[in-house]
Amino acid sequence: MSFDINWNQLTIDDTINQSIKEFLDQQFKKISLPSFISNLSVTDFNLGEIPPEITIRHIGDPFEEFYEDEDNLGATNETNHNLNDERSTMGKSQENGIHKDNAYNSQNFDDDDDDDEGVDEDDDDDEYDDHDLGTINEGISLLNFNDSSTTPSGNSFGGSIAPLPPPPLNPSRDSFHSILHPYGVNSIIGATGAGSETPTNILNQNYLSSRVLPKISVKQKQPHHDDNDIQLIVEINYKGDMHINLLVNLLVNYPSPNFISLPIKLHITDIVIHSIATIAYLKKSVYLSFLCDVDDAFPDFDSNNNAQTPTSTTGGNFVDYYSNDAAINKERIDIVKKIKIESEIGEVENNILRNVGKVEKFLVEQLRNILRDEIAWPSWICIDMNDDGDDDDDDEVEDSNVSDGDGKDNDGKHGDGPTHEV
C-alpha cells in the first residue's frame, strides 16, 4: 500500500523548518567539541521540495510505550495509596497497643490476664503480618510490571497474545535488529498482498525493555488512550533535496591556543534514508521513530569504486561519507546512509583552505549520533499539531511533566506551529 504526500502543505509554513533548525542547534550545542573547532551552530534548515517515498507495511494500534506515563502514574498512585494505608493501619495498631498497655497496667497482674495479653499480641501480629505480606506481593507485581516489556507485538497489530512471564532485560539498546521479523526485514519489504509473510510480527515484545525511556517529546507521552489513535509501520525511502547549513570556527592552536580562528560554512545535502519507521497519530500529536535500516544495494556505491570504506576527497570543497560495512551497520541503526558536505572557509573569493575533511567527518558522525539517540527506537520525536487553544488546557500538565534528561524543565516551543522538546 502506498499513498501520495502533499509535501507543499508541509513546507509552505516555515515554522516547521525553523523548529527543526532550533532543535538541531540545541543538540549540537550539547556536543563536546574537539580542540580544533569552536562555536558550532545550525544557521539554516530546509526540508526541500522532493518528498520521500513512503509505503505502508502495517496499520494497527500505537505502541504502549507512547502511553507509559499513564500506567506508571497509576502504579505510583496505587503504591502511594497502599503505603498510606499501611501507615494508617500501623498507626491504629500502635494506638490500640497504647490503650491496651494502659488498661493492662491498671489491672492486677494475674495469670489469666497474661494469657489474654499474649493472645491479643498474637492477633495483632497476625493482622500486621498479613497486611505486610500483601504489600510485598503488590510490590513484586509492581516490580514485574516495571521490568517487563510493554511494546505489544500481537495487540498492537490486531492480534492476541497469551500471558507470558516477564522476559529478561535486554542488556543493550543497540540490538534492535534481534527483535525484527524472524525472516528478516527484506522479507517484510518484499512481501506482497498475496504472500503468506506479513509484517504482523515485525516486533517481538519479549526482547524489548521499557527501562530505556525516550529522550525527545513535546508532551512526553499521551496520558490517555483514544479510539482514534492509530499507528503505521512504514518504509521510508528518501533521496531528496533537504539541506542543513552549519557555521563553525576552525582553530589553529600553534604557537598558542586559538592563535587563528577561521569561520567555516558547511552545507549538508544529498541525504539518503531507507528505513522502517513507525508513525503514530495520538490526539493531534504525531510520533515518529525509526525502527531499523533497510539493507539494499545503492548503485552509487557500486559504481563509484570497489573500496570497502571510501575516503574523503581531497583538493575539492565537498566530501561524501557513507559506509557499506555490514558489521558496523548491524551493530546500530544508521538512519542516514549517505550524505554530502560542501565547505567554505572565510570569504568565497579568498577560499584558500579546502581540505577540512577532519572537521566534516566529525560533524557527520555527530549528526548521525544525534539522529540515532533521538529518533531511533526506543527514542522518538513528537510533533504537536494542537492549536494554541487546545494547549491552554494542558499547560498545567505540561509544566509539571515536561523535562529533559537532566531533570530541567524545557518547554521547547518555537513559534506557533509544531514544537519539539528535549
UniProtKB/Swiss-Prot annotation:
Name the coiled-coil region(s): none
Start and end residues of each stretch annotated as Disordered? 74-134, 387-422
PROSITE patterns given in the database record? SMP
The record lists its disulfide bonds as none
Give the subcellular location: Mitochondrion outer membrane; Endoplasmic reticulum membrane
Q: Which domain of life is it from?
A: Eukaryota
Q: Is this entry keyworded Membrane?
A: yes
GO MF terms listed in the record are:
lipid binding
| Chain's role | Component of the ERMES/MDM complex, which serves as a molecular tether to connect the endoplasmic reticulum (ER) and mitochondria. Components of this complex are involved in the control of mitochondrial shape and protein biogenesis, and function in nonvesicular lipid trafficking between the ER and mitochondria. MDM12 is required for the interaction of the ER-resident membrane protein MMM1 and the outer mitochondrial membrane-resident beta-barrel protein MDM10.
* HAMAP family hit by this protein: Mdm12
Q: Please state which protein family the record places this protein in.
A: Belongs to the MDM12 family.
Name used for this protein in its record: Mitochondrial distribution and morphology protein 12
Gene name of this polypeptide: MDM12
